[in-house]
């Protein structure tokens, strides 16, 4: 096997650098996007179940009771595996929402029910880089007596914190 000439070596290094320069940002973007799918998909699941529940119940009991962020402490720069019972609150059971695998976000559900009008807001927050600044996601819905439930667009604050 012969040694590479300086020109061949320069071409190989240049080609390797070009491949790395295009592949690394794409890889990092895909990893980051996969982390963003957790709060978006989680809130979509919560909203879908809350809306389905509201369409079949009287307005004054359309949405389950509010529940604080679960887990109580927002994960910081790590995935957490919740101990048994973390997602056993009646609201999470009514919405059939929990995590069996490690996750990076905490979720909350806020509701207000009355005879003529009921609302909910589901929230997710996470601190992917552990700097104490959280990304926040929220989706809201409502139902008026005699009408179909409505969902608002998802709100995202500090998507990349």
Predicted regions and their residues:
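N-terminal single-pass transmembrane signal-anchor helix
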Residues: 1-31
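Acidic, glycine-anchored loop motifs typical of Ca2+
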Residues: 127-134
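Short, glycine/small-hydrophobic-rich surface segments
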Residues: 40-45, 50-97
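Low-complexity, S/T/G/P-rich flexible repeat/linker segments used as non-globular hinges
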Residues: 134-161
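Short amphipathic beta-strand and strand-loop transition segments with alternating hydrophobic
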Residues: 104-115
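Repeat-solenoid scaffold signature
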Residues: 21, 29-32, 36-48
